[in-house]
Amino acid sequence: MSDQRRKSAGRRKYTPRRKVCVFTAEGIVPDYKDIKRLQRMVSDRGKILPRRRTGTCAKYQRKLNVAIKRARHLALLPFVSENTRG
């Protein structure tokens, strides 16, 4: 009897919620001038976050990469964070 309780009282399996592409849902295109939105797609070290982490679809991930690189080139977004600078 106690064995059955232990098995049923085990941990529940974690099922991650499916991430929805923000750009598709809101109907917008990634723009290099939208710094707030671009900063959410960049890690604290300054790296571009992957699709599996942000939930963006392939089409908008490619456009997002171009927008982030363009914003970096125009000095709207830093290449690295303040913490990693020497």
From Swiss-Prot:
A Pfam family it matches: Ribosomal_S18
Q: Which family does the record claim for this protein?
A: Belongs to the bacterial ribosomal protein bS18 family.
* Annotated GO CC locations: cytosolic small ribosomal subunit
Q: What is this protein called?
A: Small ribosomal subunit protein bS18
Q: Does the keyword RNA-binding apply?
A: yes
Top-level lineage group:
Bacteria
The top of its lineage is: Bacteria, Bacillati, Chloroflexota, Chloroflexia, Herpetosiphonales
* Description of how the protein assembles with itself and partners: Part of the 30S ribosomal subunit. Forms a tight heterodimer with protein bS6.
